[in-house]
Amino acid sequence: MNFILFIFIPGVFSLKSSTLKPTIEALPNVLPLNEDVNKQEEKNEDHTPNYAPANEKNGNYYKDIKQYVFTTQNPNGTESEISVRATTDLNFALKNDKTVNATTYEKSTIEEETTTSEPSHKNIQRSTPNVPAFWTMLAKAINGTAVVMDDKDQLFHPIPESDVNATQGENQPDLEDLKIKIMLGISLMTLLLFVVLLAFCSATLYKLRHLSYKSCESQYSVNPELATMSYFHPSEGVSDTSFSKSAESSTFLGTTSSDMRRSGTRTSESKIMTDIISIGSDNEMHENDESVTR
């Protein structure tokens, strides 16, 4: 781009030098050039480095396009703007010599015409921010330098974790409610199983106790026939002696309750025999008493 400007500016100088070149009479403030001024300019040119135009060989072709605008005051009292666009870094040396006013005036007028002759789409591009090229961003990423991001470059940023976690945060209350419901269901199931187990244990204990009570009653059963036969009725007119003898005979021939349980029929027969013997002995004693009284 600089190379094109360097070609374009000398052509404009050669075409319009007759019309734009002011005379010394028209510019009274301009002084003639001296040898000292030329020497100072040569020294300044020696100190200023020469920047080669950007091309593909030197690696500066993909640098950012920068625009510089300078305002200068003309001897007539008007101001002119100098606009420079370049793809490389520029260093400007400002000189405060009065002898250079003629050349600056010529340059300002030429650059004003060039800026007005530029198409409108270039002016529109100036207002938009300069987006760094892909290769410059890649080089800066490799070198480890910080890259300044513009508005358009924000599209390349990764999604922040806060935005990702926002959707997950909405689902967290649902998960918490589900966990609480599961815990309540498990606790209710355990309580129900405990109640069922307790009822089963109480029922089995009641049955075992009832069976043991029945077994005790079966061991000590009473035969009603034997109870009526062994029961003595004193109202039948038997004397005390016969009662005592019958008691002695019953004790002498008596049987225990265990013998009665073992053989129910044998005990009944023995009781009958003892009753018969006791009755016979009572009758004999009664007859003897009557004979003695006679």
Swiss-Prot record:
It is a single-pass type I membrane protein. Residues 1-14 form the signal peptide. Coiled coil: none annotated. It is found in: Cytoplasmic vesicle, Secretory vesicle, Acrosome membrane; Cytoplasmic vesicle, Secretory vesicle, Acrosome inner membrane; Cytoplasmic vesicle, Secretory vesicle, Acrosome outer membrane. The keyword Ubl conjugation does not apply. One of its GO terms (cellular component) is plasma membrane. Glycans are attached at residues 76, 143. Interacts with SNAP25. PANTHER family: EQUATORIN. Acrosomal membrane-anchored protein involved in the process of fertilization and in acrosome biogenesis. This is Equatorin. It comes from Homo sapiens. The lineage of its organism: Eukaryota, Metazoa, Chordata, Craniata, Vertebrata. The gene is EQTN.
